[in-house]
Swiss-Prot record:
The gene is FOXD2. Kidney specific. Residues 397-406, 419-434 have a biased composition (Gly residues). Its main location: nucleus. This is Forkhead box protein D2. The keyword DNA repair does not apply. GO terms for molecular function: DNA-binding transcription activator activity, RNA polymerase II-specific; DNA-binding transcription factor activity; DNA-binding transcription factor activity, RNA polymerase II-specific; RNA polymerase II cis-regulatory region sequence-specific DNA binding; sequence-specific DNA binding; sequence-specific double-stranded DNA binding. The keyword Kinase does not apply. InterPro entries: Fork_head_dom (IPR001766), FOX_domain-containing (IPR050211), TF_fork_head_CS_1 (IPR018122), TF_fork_head_CS_2 (IPR030456), WH-like_DNA-bd_sf (IPR036388), WH_DNA-bd_sf (IPR036390). Residues 47-59 have a biased composition (Basic and acidic residues).
Amino acid sequence: MTLGSCCCEIMSSESSPAALSEADADIDVVGGGSGGGELPARSGPRAPRDVLPHGHEPPAEEAEADLAEDEEESGGCSDGEPRALASRGAAAAAGSPGPGAAAARGAAGPGPGPPSGGAATRSPLVKPPYSYIALITMAILQSPKKRLTLSEICEFISGRFPYYREKFPAWQNSIRHNLSLNDCFVKIPREPGNPGKGNYWTLDPESADMFDNGSFLRRRKRFKRQPLPPPHPHPHPHPELLLRGGAAAAGDPGAFLPGFAAYGAYGYGYGLALPAYGAPPPGPAPHPHPHPHAFAFAAAAAAAPCQLSVPPGRAAAPPPGPPTASVFAGAGSAPAPAPASGSGPGPGPAGLPAFLGAELGCAKAFYAASLSPPAAGTAAGLPTALLRQGLKTDAGGGAGGGGAGAGQRPSFSIDHIMGHGGGGAAPPGAGEGSPGPPFAAAAGPGGQAQVLAMLTAPALAPVAGHIRLSHPGDALLSSGSRFASKVAGLSGCHF
């Protein structure tokens, strides 16, 4: 190897980039080998020695000067190769890498390259541009009955959009929250004969214009359900309207039932079974102004005259009805007939039954004939007709007694019974206040004695044992001495 060839090699390595890259690739190989006289053969193309990168030939004087400087700096090489070449090659290798290194990296890079390129070519699933409200609305509108459950809504969305099919469990809660929080969706309970899980969901009829021109890409505004106006009840409703529900007379079926009026817009088209509007409310509120007819019975009862305030000289009026029946009505099968009213102003035999009926009518109802205990003694089968007949005065029965004449009928007024009237004598112990039967004064005449015997008969003992006279007037029947003192106070009877 000559010195000129070494200089040409140095010039070619500095001028051509391709040659520099090849020298870089070969530097590692050269640096790793042990001395040799010649450089290894190059596989790549070589640049011409006499051609510079800019296409100018170096002058001969400059070439000779460079050659002399190289010889002085190197001072010769033991292995036959100048040191400047090795130093410059090492600097070039440590410096900026050439295109050869990039090519080497490119050759080593194609391994993982194709998989990344294949993933880029595969298009991922794109999320649909619809909101959850739009997706739910699509699902409900496509159903035949315009109502779906939560599972049916999710099934429709998964079958139509592959993006939601792959990410199913994540967005199901979002559908549930949108159904509950938006007023445009109405929950419909299941019918009793339709078993299953979950309620139905439908659209509010007033939310039809929620989307612009029927496009689900954009919602016009958030739907808010308008509250129902409060009902205006009648200031003075009639009690009959409150009891009957007011379905026919009120005109507005939702006036008394405001809770059911909220579902009136949905009707039965969506399968909503609503109760009838004519059902009465649980209970009418108390009327602030009671009806005037409410106190009609109380006013009539207050204005009715008391039966015990009849003057002594006038017969008492018959009782008005069954509540004031005779005391002997409980022992027989039929009530006592009303006495005749044509007896005149004089005393008549109807005074005693009327008094007993008026006195006992204020107490509770007696036991029925079937519930009364059987009579004891020989008077158990005593018919009611005999009791009634005993109360009547017998014109011929007064012969055995000296109190009344043959043609005169004894009086049964209060004064006559107590001994203040003619025809009867006072009982022996009446003046001392000894207690006794109230009709003991009538023991003189035969008819009155018969009445007293019948009143004190054992047949009336069970009746007296079962009848509880709780009225203050009971004392009138228990003591004959105190009866006369209380006659004056009977005019103000309060029952």
